[in-house]
Amino acid sequence: MRRFFFMLTCVALVIPGAAFSKIKVAASITDLASIASSVGGDQVECFAIAKATADAHRVEVLPSYMVKVSKANVYLKGGLGLDQWSDAIIDGSRNDRLTVVDCSAGVSVLEKPAGAVDASMGDVHPNGNPHYWLDPRNGGVVARTIAEALGRVDPAHAADYQSRAEQFAQQCDASYAADRKIADAIPNRVVFTYHRSWPYFANAFGFEIAGQAEPVPGIPPTAKHLADLVSIAKSRKIAVLIQEPYFSADAGKFLQREAGVQSVVMPLSCDGAEAGSYLAHIDAVLKALAAVKGES
């Protein structure tokens, strides 16, 4: 009998997965993968489908994604219509054991349409704006949602996940407090954005979005609309256009030439800026805005 247990111990030491297999977590976007890594610690292995610099609304569904998700235990969706392509990946994975989590649950959603939504309004999300992670105060909400899901999949470590989620929520609060001081030192926080991606960020840090380069969400800028923005920029001394890297730079160049507006090109998700983690990315966006001449 002793020899039997000795051999089992040796197998566990040589092949760690035989004794302690990690929970595999797939996430639609890198921010959710980053938060899940903080919550899961050594018990999880996380990967994201969409790259940080990609448009998370439009991801090509590849068979390789389905294969990866077929081996996952948990799939984290952004929700609110952000990543509807996730459904095709989940269905194609044929993974009946997969726990699917809507990470928007519990978040205070902004920009819910008051009435019916139609095509004339552009790419409007009927359940509200889906870019909630750009307010770091929502990071703790998401962390707790992820911890609850991981605890259901792996009850033996449920307390660990909950503890790490609370620690992460505290980190989010501390990071927000520090970054809010940076934001409050910016004298003019009236900005343009290319797309309606930044309301949560603006709400968190006291920015006012005076207009978008797109006349309506998803519709490219028109000459008349850009001319209107030039007038607004001059009258309100707007110095910044916040733009994602996958949009054309033409509108930004026009606004800079005609009104001195500078483009700050930043991804919506972590790993696309200088800093790799969720909170570090938000910090990097804020510091990039503070560094613009005329803003600080």
Predicted region positions:
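Extracytoplasmic metal-acquisition and chelation regions
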Residues: 20-296
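Cleavable N-terminal signal peptides
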Residues: 8-9, 19
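N-terminal signal peptide c-region/cleavage motif recognized by signal peptidases
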Residues: 14-16
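Bacterial N-terminal signal peptides that target proteins for export
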Residues: 1-8
